[in-house]
């Protein structure tokens, strides 16, 4: 075929495939794909839309920044190996793993870095990744801020009060209500080691998920607004300890969750995918 149009099993595979097709070692081909997968993310200073040239030989891989104000350095190229990786030294593919633990980086010109030492470790069998997601419901989002120290100290009680008001309206099932407390544990949740040391200000994001937009909006609105009226010990007022940057809650994209995250061993990886050859043009 002169032109191939298809999906990709990984970003790196798009660039590794032609190198493998022309007989280059998988050790270098897969690293070539890895370094080129996000264009100039492997260069500095940052410029995500710029171009990088990758060169492969029997001995090494070389990455050169094409923009005159960018350069591929030892730090930028090796740092890109950590991109979207829980382990910066390895990346898994359908038929094996790229081991980067022994990579050596050499600055051979101002804009070019040379890479050696990568190893591709093939698996005995090819594994095809299966991923799936399912829609949970429609979603609305609301925001509020808290500056009052007493309310910050009792923010869980404030959230609990709001949840009870939603429960009084909708019961306990048929919707989801989520609170992210930024300034305390909004990013890491229960894994946050400094959860007992909140900041002097908190931002709370409220997400309501329900089968319909109307219900999701109301769940979110009640879950947000009722924080304003939360009853706390030692507070004589009836409202006012929460500030709202917006008058409304905002319609967001639908909520989805993972339903499938698996790999399946296959004897022939192409058996799962249809291939069509079409003659185009005159």
What are these regions (language model features)?
Residues 124-282:
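C-terminal non-catalytic interaction/assembly regions of soluble proteins
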Residues 7, 38, 165-169:
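Short hydrophobic alpha-helical module
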Residues 10-23:
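Short Gly/Thr/Asp-enriched flexible loops that form oxyanion-binding sites at enzyme active sites
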Residues 7-13, 211-213:
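Gly/Ser/Thr-rich loops at beta-strand to alpha-helix junctions
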Residues 26:
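A mobile, often basic/glycine-rich helix-loop segment
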Residues 29, 33-154:
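A conserved active-site cap/scaffold subdomain adjacent to cofactor or substrate pockets
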Residues 1-6:
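An acidic, phosphate/nucleotide-engaging active-site surface
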């Amino acid at each position: 075929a002169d032109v191939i149009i298809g999906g990709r099993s990984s970003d790196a595979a798009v660039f590794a495939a032609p190198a493998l097709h022309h007989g280059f070692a998988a050790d270098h081909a897969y690293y070539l794909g890895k370094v080129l997968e996000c264009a100039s993310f492997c260069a500095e200073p940052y410029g995500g839309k710029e171009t990088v040239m990758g060169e492969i030989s029997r001995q090494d891989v070389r990455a050169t920044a094409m923009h005159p104000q960018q350069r591929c350095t030892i730090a930028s190229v090796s740092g890109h190996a950590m991109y979207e990786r829980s382990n910066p030294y390895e990346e898994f593919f359908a038929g094996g793993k790229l081991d980067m633990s022994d990579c050596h980086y050499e600055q051979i010109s101002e804009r070019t870095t040379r890479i050696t030492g990568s190893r591709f470790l093939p698996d005995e069998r090819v594994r095809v990744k299966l991923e799936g997601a399912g829609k949970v419901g429609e979603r609305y989002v609301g925001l509020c801020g808290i500056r009052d120290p007493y309310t910050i100290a009792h923010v869980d009680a404030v959230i609990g009060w709001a949840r009870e008001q939603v429960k009084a309206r909708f019961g306990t099932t048929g919707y989801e209500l989520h609170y992210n407390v930024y300034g305390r544990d909004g990013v890491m949740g229960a894994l946050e080691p400094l959860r007992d040391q909140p900041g002097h200000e908190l931002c709370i994001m409220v997400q309501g998920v329900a089968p319909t937009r109307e219900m999701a909006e109301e769940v979110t609105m009640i879950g947000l607004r009722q924080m304003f009226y939360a009853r706390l010990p030692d507070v004589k007022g009836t409202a006012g300890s929460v500030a709202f940057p917006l008058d409304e809650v905002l319609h967001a994209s639908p909520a989805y969750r993972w339903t499938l995250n698996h790999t399946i061993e296959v004897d022939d990886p192409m058996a799962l995918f249809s291939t069509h050859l079409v003659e185009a043009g005159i």
